[in-house]
Each structure stands twice: as structure tokens, then as C-alpha cells.
């Protein structure tokens, strides 16, 4: 049979929302989204036709992981136009929670290549079998005020606050403002004869942004690995041993 590699992944995407309009100028929208993935990866090297398989008398692995991401958004919007003035005010919140878990097991020493599941393995790997899990969350609050006069002169101000579980509790939150202004030149009277220009706008702005990409889920904490020994063979105790595998990232901890 040789090498057998199998991968199966299932994904569930679900979303629901509620839209409330107390009066024409005011709208409230609430949205809940679920994104769940389950993946299974299995391998089998038979004990006969492959060199590595013959060396291990057959080898198999089973790796599984599940990731669930929940997002809950709430947005309140107010729009009002009066004469040549236009005003939009928006405020909202966003919450995201991610839960990840995985497990892996490897076995060897098969009597034949007919049964490839791990329950037919006569030896389970001690150092290549285990489980893992991680979780992170982020909470955000945001708002925007936009004003325009005659659809020609526009100003916008934004403010956003984000709090991430990946950062130390003492400096977990960040506030990010932004401002912009625009002039729609094509709407001015002196542009009326320039029919070859449909829309011409001059815009400038300034803002700050933040992100948590590249930061580990527990980067500000001391982390440990758990090691196991075959105590029943060596005559030792059956206690697991733990040792540090990574120091916390200094820029993410409270000093």
C-alpha cells in the first residue's frame, strides 16, 4: 500500500442579525457570527513497502484540531440631513472569542498493512503524543462622527478602543483616534464646464491603528512544557516533569 495520507476538514459558518429602526434616522444592528473548523489528518506507512515503514515496522499518526471563533457586533447609527447639512453619528462594540484545541498520537509496530488504525499499533510514541489548547479574546468600542456641508466639505472623526487578552492586564487597552477632511472640488461652480471630470475630491487625514498579529496567545506569561518518562521500564516514579520552554516577552509584561 505504501504511504497513505488523508485529510478531512469540516467548516461551519453561521450568522444571524437583528435590525431595529425606531425611526427613520436611527438604526440599531446586532450580529452574531460563528466560525467553527474541525480537521483530521491521518498518515500510515505500511511495514512492508516503504523503507521508513520497515524500519518502524509500520507507522501511523492521527492529528485532530478544532477552532471556534465567536463574534458579536452591535452598531447604532444616526443619520440626519437638514437643508445643506448632513450629519452621521455611529457608535458600537465588537467582541471576538477564539478557542483552539488539538491532539496528536503516533504509533508503530504493526503486524500487517491490513489494519491501519492506531488501535492496531503495538507501540505508542511517548514523545510524539499529546494535547494542546489556547484561547484569546478581544473587545472593542468605537465611534464615528461625520459632517458634510452641501456634500462638498466633509469632516470625519473616529475613535476606537481595543482590549486584547494577549497583552498584560495592566496595559491591555489601546485607544486609536483618527481624523479626516475632504473637499469635493468637482461640485464647485467653477468646475461646471469641465464635463470630462465626473468626481474630483481632495482628501487628507491622520490616524493611529493597532493590531495583535504576531503576538502569542500567552506571550506575557511564563510558559512550561510537560515531559513524561517511561517510569515502568526505568523503575522511576510515575510523576511528570515540567520545565520552562519560553520566557515572557519583556515588552508585553508589566515591569
Model-derived features: where do they sit?
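Short amphipathic helix-turn modules centered on a small-residue break
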Residues: 47-49
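Extracellular/periplasmic, surface-exposed regions of secreted and cell-surface proteins
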Residues: 1-45, 54-253
Amino acid at each position: 500500500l505504501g504511504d497513505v495520507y488523508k485529510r478531512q476538514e469540516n467548516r461551519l459558518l453561521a450568522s444571524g442579525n437583528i435590525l431595529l429602526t425606531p425611526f427613520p434616522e436611527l438604526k440599531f444592528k446586532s450580529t452574531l457570527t460563528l466560525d467553527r473548523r474541525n480537521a483530521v489528518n491521518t498518515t500510515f506507512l505500511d511495514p512492508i513497502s516503504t523503507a521508513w515503514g520497515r524500519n518502524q515496522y509500520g507507522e501511523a499518526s492521527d492529528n485532530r484540531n478544532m477552532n471556534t471563533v465567536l463574534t458579536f457586533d452591535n452598531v447604532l447609527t444616526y443619520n440626519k440631513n437638514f437643508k445643506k447639512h448632513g450629519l452621521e453619528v455611529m457608535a458600537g462594540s465588537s467582541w471576538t472569542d477564539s478557542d483552539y484545541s488539538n491532539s496528536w498520537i503516533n504509533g508503530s509496530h504493526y503486524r500487517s498493512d491490513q489494519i491501519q488504525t492506531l488501535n492496531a499499533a503495538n507501540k505508542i510514541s511517548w514523545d510524539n503524543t499529546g494535547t494542546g489548547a489556547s484561547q484569546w479574546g478581544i473587545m472593542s468600542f468605537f465611534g464615528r462622527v461625520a459632517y458634510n456641508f452641501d456634500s462638498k466639505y466633509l469632516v470625519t472623526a473616529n475613535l476606537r478602543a481595543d482590549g486584547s487578552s494577549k497583552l498584560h492586564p495592566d496595559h491591555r487597552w489601546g485607544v486609536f483616534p483618527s481624523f479626516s477632511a475632504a473637499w469635493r472640488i468637482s461640485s464647485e461652480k467653477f468646475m461646471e464646464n469641465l464635463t470630462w471630470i465626473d468626481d474630483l475630491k481632495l482628501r487628507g487625514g491622520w490616524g493611529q491603528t493597532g493590531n495583535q498579529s504576531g503576538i502569542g496567545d500567552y506571550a506575557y506569561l511564563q510558559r512550561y512544557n510537560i515531559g513524561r518518562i517511561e517510569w515502568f521500564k526505568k523503575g522511576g516514579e510515575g510523576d511528570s516533569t515540567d520545565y520552562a520552554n519560553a520566557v515572557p516577552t519583556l515588552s508585553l509584561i508589566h515591569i
